[in-house]
Amino acid sequence: MFKRKKNAGQKRTTIIDSDSSSEGSGDESALSSAFKRRKNDTQKRTTPTSVATSTKVRAPSFSSTIDHSHSRNLSKTDEATKETILYAKDDSDDSQKLSKGPYKVPFSKPTTTTTVGLKASSNIKSTTSQDYQPDVCKDYKLTGFCGYGDSCKFLHMREDYKAGWQIEREWEIKNREDDPPRDAGGVSRDADTATSRADSGIPDTCPICQGEFKSPVVTQCCHYFCEKCFLAKHKKKQNCFVCGKNTNGVCKPFKR
């Protein structure tokens, strides 16, 4: 068995040696024509493939294309696109200025304006109330109606009541009125002297002018004088004319 050669179908190119130049030129022309024919054959073979690739259908692109070229030519007169306003530099800004000293330290210009708070509104009225009875329903007390009804957890009552501080204040006022007068040392007088003076009442005559009382006044030490006599005596000496205690010029009119 004979093996078939791999280059059995290929054409053989023979080179013929010749002595004359004429023969060489003829052979060269034959070789060049052979090579040209082979080159033309390759071009013919590759032409269908190139045509096929050129006529290949492309897939349509569904991506939307937006033209942004118009955004570059914005009008500089618009308020929103004014570059002069956006990038304007304040002439009064001295933060970039340097001091004239040897270290060239930036300094800030001291502010000459005084900062004040906001002005309060003149058309708003605010009221503040202190709740001393948090267990009483305020709606029911003021209006007699409560939106929660019987399920309200606060007490439904409309009676007048007094808070603890009101009771203590009335108690102090009552004790101040009933308390017997005290002398300059702050020591209360004996009950016997107070009751005896109350039983005896006002003396018949003024101890200064020895006459009847005209517009009587009483001092802190419970001595009675005429108003005119007391003021005249007070200009010279502030002590009581009867007991000698310092009255500090204080007296109050006596009402029978």
From Swiss-Prot:
Lineage: Eukaryota, Fungi, Dikarya, Ascomycota, Saccharomycotina
GO-annotated cellular components: U2-type spliceosomal complex
Quaternary structure, from the entry: Associated with the spliceosome.
Main location: nucleus
The keyword Calcium is annotated on this UniProt entry: no
Signal peptide: none
ZnF bounds (RING-type): 206-244
CDD domains: RING-HC_RNF113A_B (cd16539)
Ranges of biased composition (kind: Low complexity): 18-34
Nucleus keyword on record: yes
Similarity-based family: Belongs to the CWC24 family.
Region Disordered: start-end pairs: 1-80, 173-200
GO terms of biological process kind: mRNA processing; snoRNA splicing
Protein name, per record: Pre-mRNA-splicing factor CWC24
Gene (UniProt): CWC24
Annotated Pfam families: zf-C3HC4_2 (PF13923), zf-CCCH (PF00642)
Disulfide bonds: none
GO molecular function, one term: DNA binding
